[in-house]
Amino acid sequence: IQTFFLLDVIACVSPIGIFLGRIANFINAELVGKVSNVPWSVIFPMTDSLPRHPSQLYEAILEGLVLFLILNLIFFKKNYKIGTCSYIFLIGYGTFRIISEFFREPDAHLGYFFNILSMGTLLSIFMVITGLIIAKFFYKKHV
């Protein structure tokens, strides 16, 4: 079995685990969002009793459901090329994570780097760059 085919299969099912993990984070009031006044704000028990973005649900939708749909639509296309889902996963997950980090409190012990980037954002930037490098490799290989 080819390595990138196996990685593609793993990439296509990983969003299911990410979705379930983020739902568990929401239920357990973990990784809470930033304080907010939007109508769908949530007050989590055993926190500071302030209304917050349900950032775990944003992540469940983007990194879980949306990414799952994108990857599986690509994987089951007639002209699917091995490796495509691998780099799309890295680019997609990284991008969706960067977006969702704007609504999420940074880890208390880490805070922000350069007063703007959370650790999640920083790592996601590297993930997107890695995905783009792999995409360039596959593009050169198939052209």
PLM ranges: what are they?
Residues 1-143:
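A feature for loop-to-transmembrane-helix boundaries and adjacent hydrophobic helices
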